[in-house]
A protein has these predicted regions:
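Structural motif corresponding to the intra-repeat A-B loop/turn of tetratricopeptide repeats
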Residues: 5, 38-39, 71-72
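Residue-level signature for tetratricopeptide repeat
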Residues: 1, 30-35, 67-68
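Boundary/linker segments of alpha-helical solenoid repeat arrays
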Residues: 22-27, 54-63, 87-111, 125, ...
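Alpha-helical segment of the N-proximal tetratricopeptide repeat
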Residues: 1-7
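Solenoid-like repeat scaffolds
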Residues: 15-23, 47-57, 82-90, 120-123, ...
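Hydrophobic transmembrane helix bundles of membrane-integrated enzymes that assemble
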Residues: 48, 60-68
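Long, internal scaffold/assembly segments composed of regular secondary structure
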Residues: 96-170
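Solenoid-repeat scaffolds in large eukaryotic assemblies
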Residues: 8-11, 43-45, 74-80
Length: 170
């Protein structure tokens, strides 16, 4: 019901007042992904700063670690990454993005992933030359992210003869 009605303030209140992040990871993912798709990273990360429990869900844990890095809490983020690795965590794409953001790698990581909105955001954040052309199969979340981050082609610059590009923008 909460997701269907998309009342983000009510969802946030419900999750944080009851501290049920681990009992309802789907609702938490919906909330932070929606904020990120609107380019409201600060709001998404504020959710994690208010969570008192250890985050069990892998995706939410990755998001939390990224927020720590974004808030310059590198040591805390590194500790959580090390703990996750000891428990068998392995995600080469995610790790390479974080290594760049933490300054361990100096060469920008240019791979782009549309697997999740977090992966897509990390793709954008770690690539100074980021270019992405959405297609009909691009998720609505990514379209929203592209729009709110001003990453869509300027409509005036689109060739009027490029029917595919025009229809995908529509």
């Amino acid at each position: 019901w909460l997701i269907k009605n998309s009342n983000l303030q009510l969802i946030e209140k419900y999750l944080l007042n009851n501290q049920i992040i681990n009992q309802n990871p789907r609702l938490t993912k919906y909330l932070v992904d929606d904020y990120l798709s609107r380019s409201e990273l600060k709001k998404a990360c504020e959710i994690f700063s208010k969570i008192k429990d250890f985050i069990e869900d892998e995706y939410l844990s990755k998001f939390n670690i990224y927020c720590l890095i974004n808030n310059q809490k590198i040591d805390e983020a590194q500790l959580l990454i090390d703990l996750k690795k000891e428990l068998g965590f392995m995600d080469k794409f995610y790790e390479s993005k974080l290594n760049y953001l933490m300054g361990y790698d100096t060469k920008p990581e240019t791979a782009i992933s549309q697997k999740t909105i977090l992966d897509f955001h990390l793709s954008h954040r770690t690539n100074p030359e980021f270019q992405f052309i959405p297609t009909d199969s691009t998720s609505k979340q990514i379209w929203k992210y592209l729009s709110t981050s001003n990453l869509l082609d300027n409509i005036q610059e689109v060739e009027l003869t490029d029917i595919d590009k025009i229809s995908s923008i529509e």
